[in-house]
Amino acid sequence: MKGLITTALAVLLLAGCAGHQTPAFSPTLDEVFATRRSIRAYEAGRTISEAEVRELLTATQNAPSWANQQPSNYYVAIGAEKREAVLELIGGNKERVINAPVFIVSTFERGKSGFFRGTPTDATGDFWGAYDNGLSNAYLILKARAMGFDTLIMGMRDADALRALFAIPDNETVLAVIALGYRAQDPATPAHRPLDEIAKFF
C-alpha cells in the first residue's frame, strides 16, 4: 500500500510539473512593438526552418500597397552556400550578423506602384515602390518578433552582386538585406523623439 501511495504521489507531481511548463512566446501587439530592436549580435548555432520563414513572409502579403500593386519580392538565403555568399556582400555588417542563420534580400518591381499604364501618376514615381517595400518589410520584422525572432535591416550591400547571386530581374531594385535570427543579448532601448515633436494636432 505504501508503495502504491508513493507511486500515485509521483504521478501527481509529474502531472503538476507538466502543467507548469514555460509558455511559448506569444506577445501582444504592444509587446511586439516594445521589444523589437535592430539586433547586431546573434546567438550562434541556432537555426530557423524554411517553414518558419514561409510563415513569416506570409505576413508581408497583408501589407498595404499602392492600388494593391504588391511590388515587393524576397530572396531567401537559408542554405549554407548562399548565406556565406551574402555575408561577403554586406560590408561592415558582416561581423554583426555572422551568426544569423537566414538572410532575406528585399526588392521591389519598378513601374508598378505609383504608375498607371506605364506612366507615373505624380512626381513621386518609383518612390511609391520603395515606400510599399518599406511597409512590407515592417510587417516582416514585426511578424518576426511575434514569432520570437530578431532582425536587422541593412542598407549596406552590394546590390549588383546580390542581383547576380539570386538572378534578380533587372526591373527590380535591390533595397535591403534583412538578417534573421535570435538575439545574443538585449540591447538598451534607444532614445526616441518626443511625440509632440513628431506629431502636430490641429
Regions of interest found by a model, annotated:
Residues C17-F202:
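Acidic, surface-exposed loops and disordered segments
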Residues T6-A15:
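Bacterial N-terminal signal peptides
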Residues M1-L4:
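Positively charged n-region of N-terminal signal peptides that target proteins for export
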